[in-house]
């Protein structure tokens, strides 16, 4: 039996994703931006406009006329440029694969043109559509079969940092590129919903195959992380999963929130927009986040916190960011903590362990006892 990545066309989607094989996506940019796989590179056979022209031709005159039009649109220097891009990808990634939407004509043409230029490069049979279907089915299966455990705790408790120190945990916020709370927006935005789902499915596959005997540890999230929605199958599994609660003192949570939502967020905006514009975008980001929760805060509390935020921004412009701690502390004490305490109380019977970060790490380090506890809790 030949090893995976042996240069042959494949429909072994599991090993394709587990191995992290380089993927050359030959679909049009509009298709790629709607949804793609982690790390895939888009070097299309046709531009969006060319694809639209070929599609109209196919509807009016049939497949052969559409193929002929496609060859007329991508010929000469245009064809040479695209083939050169594929050649360079193949040279950089000899263990990779190319694909189109269905694994049909477009990827066959790309493969043929590459072969004519002296490069044999394999393709994924079934293409993007079959790979996407495989990931959806895998995610459904994992959510039904895996022993989930949720890491819970008050806002600002460093749960994401703790997850990173526990082998086999899956970081949903990293996949969604969002810090989870109302203030969790990142400067460079979030993936599309389909990109998020694909990345999540790949992460779950790798966790299950790399840590088969461990429970699947996720952070206790709501159904939305920013604008990325958790799949229904995962939400159902999370609604029944046992909880491990990390307990962190208020002042530690204030400091953690200050670093992440002020210092790190400002750095992100400045890297993206420059020093001055970056600060203004950062300030608007905080204002908008506060505005988004104004109804839940109530009119008076929203006004008070907004005034504290503006005062902190004014001092920050003068070089002193420390005053942000004041409104962060109030927001945690008066808004987030009561809300989360209420939510946690409703699920108190699902709590299987609670302690500080060191105790939680120790709890998960003893995987055999963790497994037993989780199993008992679900029976």
From Swiss-Prot:
Family classification: Belongs to the SelU family.
Domain Rhodanese: from-to ranges: 17-140
The species this protein was found in: Hahella chejuensis (strain KCTC 2396)
EC category: transferase
Record's catalysed reaction(s): 5-methylaminomethyl-2-thiouridine(34) in tRNA + selenophosphate + (2E)-geranyl diphosphate + H2O + H(+) = 5-methylaminomethyl-2-selenouridine(34) in tRNA + (2E)-thiogeraniol + phosphate + diphosphate; 5-methylaminomethyl-2-thiouridine(34) in tRNA + (2E)-geranyl diphosphate = 5-methylaminomethyl-S-(2E)-geranyl-thiouridine(34) in tRNA + diphosphate; 5-methylaminomethyl-S-(2E)-geranyl-thiouridine(34) in tRNA + selenophosphate + H(+) = 5-methylaminomethyl-2-(Se-phospho)selenouridine(34) in tRNA + (2E)-thiogeraniol; 5-methylaminomethyl-2-(Se-phospho)selenouridine(34) in tRNA + H2O = 5-methylaminomethyl-2-selenouridine(34) in tRNA + phosphate
Disulfide bonds: none
Keyword Amino-acid biosynthesis appears in the UniProt entry: no
Name of protein: tRNA 2-selenouridine synthase
Family annotation (InterPro entries): Rhodanese-like_dom, Rhodanese-like_dom_sf, SelU
Gene name, Swiss-Prot/TrEMBL: selU
Cited PROSITE patterns: RHODANESE_3
GO molecular function, one term: transferase activity, transferring alkyl or aryl (other than methyl) groups
